[in-house]
Design a protein with these regions (language model features):
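Extracellular "spike/adhesin" assembly and maturation modules
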Residues: 1-62, 67, 74, 86-147
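Basic/aromatic-rich interaction segments and small domains that mediate binding to polyanionic partners
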Residues: 76-80, 84
Length: 147
């Protein structure tokens, strides 16, 4: 096996020369992916002034340095862009949109927003306050968006 099964991180081999290069490449990927978040979903890296370690989900119509990497995770490193293919079921927080995105194996999507409670024939103030607090906590954690 030359790479790991989930994120295609390079593996060391017996008698391999310059093992530190392979090891460092894997560490760059681990460092970015363990964060569990990306800056945003974008198609064009041109306007960015990225710092090493920052990551983005490449949109469906990439241009420039991201051409051919639609749906992948673009990671900025000292050596340029690195691209990781997400396994089905992976979830990342999109910091710009403040939502959690999930990869289903072919595309990224955000969880649908939860409607805030309204109406009803009997209003229970304590129940509404508790539900509002739960929804606020989920939203703050990036697990839900409330409309």
């Amino acid at each position: 096996m030359s790479s790991t099964p989930n994120f295609s991180m390079p593996m060391l081999h017996a008698a391999q020369a310059q093992k530190e290069i392979t090891h460092n490449e894997a560490l760059v990927l681990v460092d970015a992916l363990l964060r569990g978040a990306v800056n945003a979903v974008l198609n064009d890296p041109a306007p960015l002034a990225p710092a090493p370690g920052q990551a983005w989900i490449v949109g469906p119509a990439p241009v420039g340095a991201w051409v051919g990497h639609a749906g992948k995770i673009a990671i900025c490193s000292d050596g340029g862009w690195r691209f990781a293919t997400a396994p089905a079921g992976m979830q990342l927080r999109d910091d710009m949109a403040a939502v959690c995105r999930r990869f289903d194996g072919s595309a990224w999507s955000a969880y649908p927003p939860i409607a805030a409670p309204v109406g009803g024939s009997i209003v229970d103030a304590e129940a509404r306050a508790t539900l509002a607090a739960v929804l606020a906590a989920l939203q703050q954690a990036g697990l839900a968006s409330v409309t």
